[in-house]
């Protein structure tokens, strides 16, 4: 493989498409990024134009190679990672979408979800798909398109229409309509896939009236799915060899491939995933059961918990409260006081996610006394991110029976040393921050590289996974438990605040 010097990861996110080129040592040699339009037709509705997703993603690929003066014949393989759950339906003949992509954040299918609950499907969905009944997942979005685009369900039955998550759509376009596939991680987010039988679930397809003919073939996350020509006909054919949903790609990029290993991504919200190996653990604590990647990209399972407000609560301090002018300043102000002076901030601006799942919770600040100043509130807001992470982790440990030895972290907020140290303090666990922060792209690159022999195995990659800094707990157990019990008390008082009839 000597002439093939690079792997490309395509990272198709919610607000932008990126291409990341890596060399054999997993160093990033070139990055290109393009933002694209968010479409909000009605309150709570979110769409993307699938053609714009494709145009932005394909142009970043060309640009990233051009920037570093790399020829396409030097590329060993392409890996794809993507925003999960987002739905595209298109015509098999023309490759044209019949409707905009319905994005994971879109809430338009709430009524369909209520109907599934009324039909008594909730327990079955949790057991078969590992998910909760929520508009977040793909299945109800596909039903909505088939219900609202005239004649589409009949066309789908005749095999004229195809469905895919974003990975499937990109591969269809990259292979000129020759390949219609997805991987196990993306399939596990559709609410149409049986995560135990590893096949599309007929009961779910019947419940949502979705024809099987429109569904992609489901494959492993690390294998050659097809080839793409960069530079049109006569160009070099490059294998597309890795696919994983963004959070599963980050888990793999952090090399959390053994049972009990976990990562937390601190972005707008937090996404925590714990690998549970070959057993699918059904959560009794409000977590999702999902498919992750084992050491060779094979099927492993994971528990997943989402916190809605992480980086977003720091933005609130900046934009609405005007307590800081830059998110980076939060660390400086938080360290100007020795503690929060008894203050707790519960950032339940849009309700609370795992493990509470209370859409009626609202944000609150508790424990105010005359001596409290803005620095205490800034510090308490940062601390709330760590407390919410502990909430999810406690649920994971209770569900899995696995004690976590270290938490690997990534995402924008991990640059905040105060937050990372407090996270370690409040968990009583080591927190490991990697040298390379692009772990999502790294995961897609690793999956593709392993499939084509660019890297032989994970041992080779283990050496490249350098931990830039390790944070260790610096407070006593009694102090840790005392602070956490204060948080639990604060959360309890923020729950069920909003009047239901308003909702």
Swiss-Prot record:
Q: Which GO terms describe its biological process?
A: glycerol catabolic process; glycerol metabolic process; glycerol-3-phosphate metabolic process
Give GO terms: molecular function aspect only: ATP binding; glycerol kinase activity; metal ion binding
Please provide the record's keywords in A-Z order: Allosteric enzyme, ATP-binding, Glycerol metabolism, Kinase, Metal-binding, Nucleotide-binding, Transferase, Zinc
- Supply one GO CC term from the record: cytosol
N-terminal signal peptide: none
Which positions in this protein are listed as binding ADP?
A: 14, 18, 268, 311, 412, 416
Q: What is its EC number?
A: 2.7.1.30
**UniProt enzyme class:** transferase
Q: Which residues hold glycerol?
A: 84-85, 136, 246-247
User: Which chemical reaction does it catalyze?
Assistant: glycerol + ATP = sn-glycerol 3-phosphate + ADP + H(+)
Stored Pfam families: FGGY_C, FGGY_N
Instruction: Tell me what controls its activity.
Output: Activity of this regulatory enzyme is affected by several metabolites. Allosterically and non-competitively inhibited by fructose 1,6-bisphosphate (FBP) and unphosphorylated phosphocarrier protein EIIA-Glc (III-Glc), an integral component of the bacterial phosphotransferase (PTS) system.
Q: Which HAMAP family match?
A: Glycerol_kin (MF_00186)
Family statement drawn from the similarity comment of this UniProt entry: Belongs to the FGGY kinase family.
Q: Which PANTHER family match?
A: GLYCEROL KINASE (PTHR10196:SF69), SUGAR KINASE (PTHR10196)
How would you summarize the oligomeric state and partners of this protein? Homotetramer and homodimer (in equilibrium). Heterodimer with EIIA-Glc. Binds 1 zinc ion per glycerol kinase EIIA-Glc dimer. The zinc ion is important for dimerization.
Q: What is this protein called?
A: Glycerol kinase
Native organism: Klebsiella pneumoniae (strain 342)
Name of the gene this protein is made from: glpK
């Amino acid at each position: 493989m000597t002439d093939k010097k690079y792997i490309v990861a395509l990272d198709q996110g919610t607000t932008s498409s990126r291409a990341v080129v890596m060399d054999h040592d997993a160093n990033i040699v070139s990055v290109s990024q393009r933002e694209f339009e968010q479409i909000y037709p009605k309150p709570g509705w979110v769409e993307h134009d699938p053609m714009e997703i494709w145009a932005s993603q394909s142009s970043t690929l060309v640009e990233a190679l051009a920037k570093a003066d790399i020829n396409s014949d030097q590329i060993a393989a392409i890996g794809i990672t993507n925003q999960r759950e987002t739905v595209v339906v298109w015509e098999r003949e023309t490759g044209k979408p019949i409707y905009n992509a319905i994005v994971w954040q879109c809430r338009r299918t709430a009524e369909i979800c209520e109907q599934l609950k009324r039909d008594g499907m909730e327990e079955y969905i949790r057991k078969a798909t590992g998910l909760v009944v929520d508009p977040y997942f793909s299945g109800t979005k596909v039903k909505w398109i088939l219900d609202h685009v005239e004649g589409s369900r009949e066309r789908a039955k005749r095999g004229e229409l195809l469905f895919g998550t974003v990975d499937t759509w990109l591969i269809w376009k990259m292979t000129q309509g020759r390949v219609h596939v997805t991987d196990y991680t993306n399939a596990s987010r559709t609410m149409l896939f049986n995560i135990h039988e590893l096949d599309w679930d007929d009961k779910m397809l019947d419940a949502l009236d979705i024809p099987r003919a429109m569904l992609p073939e489901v494959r492993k996350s690390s294998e050659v799915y097809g080839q793409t020509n960069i530079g049109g006909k006569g160009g070099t054919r490059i294998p597309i060899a890795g696919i994983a949903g963004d959070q599963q790609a980050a888990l793999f990029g952090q090399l959390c491939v053994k049972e009990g290993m976990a990562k937390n991504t601190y972005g707008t919200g937090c996404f925590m995933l714990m690998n549970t190996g070959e057993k699918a653990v059904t959560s009794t604590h409000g977590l999702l059961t999902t498919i992750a990647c084992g050491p060779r990209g094979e099927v492993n399972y994971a528990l997943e918990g989402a916190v809605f407000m992480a980086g977003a609560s720091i933005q609130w301090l900046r934009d609405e409260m005007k307590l800081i002018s830059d998110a980076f300043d939060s660390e400086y102000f938080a360290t100007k006081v020795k503690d929060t002076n008894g203050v707790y901030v519960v950032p339940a601006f849009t309700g609370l996610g795992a493990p509470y799942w209370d859409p009626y919770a609202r944000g609150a600040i508790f424990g105010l006394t005359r001596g409290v100043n803005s620095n205490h509130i800034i510090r308490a807001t940062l601390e709330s991110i760590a407390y919410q992470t502990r909430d999810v982790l406690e649920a994971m440990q209770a569900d899995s029976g696995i004690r976590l030895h270290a938490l690997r972290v990534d995402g924008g907020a991990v640059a905040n040393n105060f937050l990372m140290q407090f996270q370690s303090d409040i968990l009583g666990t080591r927190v490991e921050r990697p040298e390379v922060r692009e772990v999502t792209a790294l995961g897609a690159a690793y999956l593709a590289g392993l499939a084509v022999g660019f890297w032989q195995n994970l041992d080779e990659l283990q050496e490249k996974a350098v931990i830039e800094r390790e944070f260790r707990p610096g407070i006593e157990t009694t102090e840790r438990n005392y602070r956490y019990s204060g948080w639990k008390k604060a959360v309890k008082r923020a729950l069920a605040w909003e009047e239901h009839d308003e909702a």
